[in-house]
UniProtKB/Swiss-Prot annotation:
The gene is minC. Disulfide bonds: none annotated. PANTHER family: SEPTUM SITE-DETERMINING PROTEIN MINC. NCBIfam families: PRK00513.1-6. One of its GO terms (biological process) is division septum assembly. Pfam families: MinC_C, MinC_N_1. It comes from Clostridium botulinum (strain Eklund 17B / Type B). It comes from the Bacteria. The keyword Signal does not apply. InterPro entries: CAP/MinC_C, MinC, MinC_C_sf, MinC_N_1, Septum_form_inhib_MinC_C. Keywords: Cell cycle, Cell division, Septation. Belongs to the MinC family. Interacts with MinD and FtsZ. Cell division inhibitor that blocks the formation of polar Z ring septums. Rapidly oscillates between the poles of the cell to destabilize FtsZ filaments that have formed before they mature into polar Z rings. Prevents FtsZ polymerization. This is Probable septum site-determining protein MinC.
Length: 213
């Protein structure tokens, strides 16, 4: 651990930050130090994933929310993954605590043929995506309607992104650099579906709410 309580390292997927809360007098002191350090490389960190290793039992729930919002606004990260840090042995345990998916843009209309949406975060469309329309997002794409155009989630390379719709019938569906084209004449189910990458291939399965909470 670095003497000031914050250790930052880059990796292939983004950044790792390890925080020793016991070296700070308050949560605010830690947050200020973390933002100060990340700000030095803001140009390089923008739009990347931050894996934050910290003893979550030492941070209040409201402060965790504040930490997420501050980092997204100040550093413009795409995603934050929290991992529990076992302070006593100074090793990181592999307890997954959840993913904060980043900024989300809500579109309250139908995206029509010839229109193209692009956003450096998640996109939620309350409406349809018609054939001939395009939607591109660095994060997830959720369509509360029928999806019949071309979509690309995780377009900065995030293969953990998903695409979901009440009626999933895209012309072209792409997650990161993995692409699939819907076959013609295939009867589609009339229930919500979700597409994701598994073992290097895009799979589509029924959306089960409890599974993705």
């Amino acid at each position: 651990m670095h003497k000031d309580g914050v250790l930052i390292k880059g990796n292939r997927e983004g950044i790792n930050a390890t925080i020793d809360m016991e070296k700070f007098a308050s949560f605010e002191d830690m947050l200020n130090m973390l933002i100060k350090k990340l700000s030095k490389g803001k140009h390089f960190y923008k739009g990347t994933t931050l894996i934050l290793n910290v003893n979550l039992s030492l941070i209040k729930k409201n402060d965790i929310k504040k930490l997420k919002e501050s980092l997204l606004n100040e550093i413009e990260l795409n995603e934050i993954i929290f991992e529990q840090l076992e302070q006593e042995s100074n090793i990181q345990t592999k307890i997954f605590n959840g993913v904060y998916e980043g900024k989300t843009k809500f579109i309250r209309r139908t995206v029509r043929s010839g229109q193209c949406l692009n956003y450096p975060g998640n996109i939620v469309i309350i409406g349809d995506v018609n054939s001939g329309a395009e939607v591109h997002a660095a994060g997830n794409i959720i369509v509360l309607g029928s999806l019949k155009g071309s979509v690309n989630a995780g377009n900065t390379g995030n293969k953990k992104s998903i695409i979901a719709a009440f009626l999933l019938e895209p012309e072209i569906l792409k997650i990161a650099d993995v692409i699939t084209i819907s076959p013609d004449g295939l009867d589609k189910p009339r229930y919500p579906e979700i597409a994701k990458v598994k073992d290097g291939t895009i799979i589509v399965e029924p959306y089960l709410a409890n599974k993705y909470i």
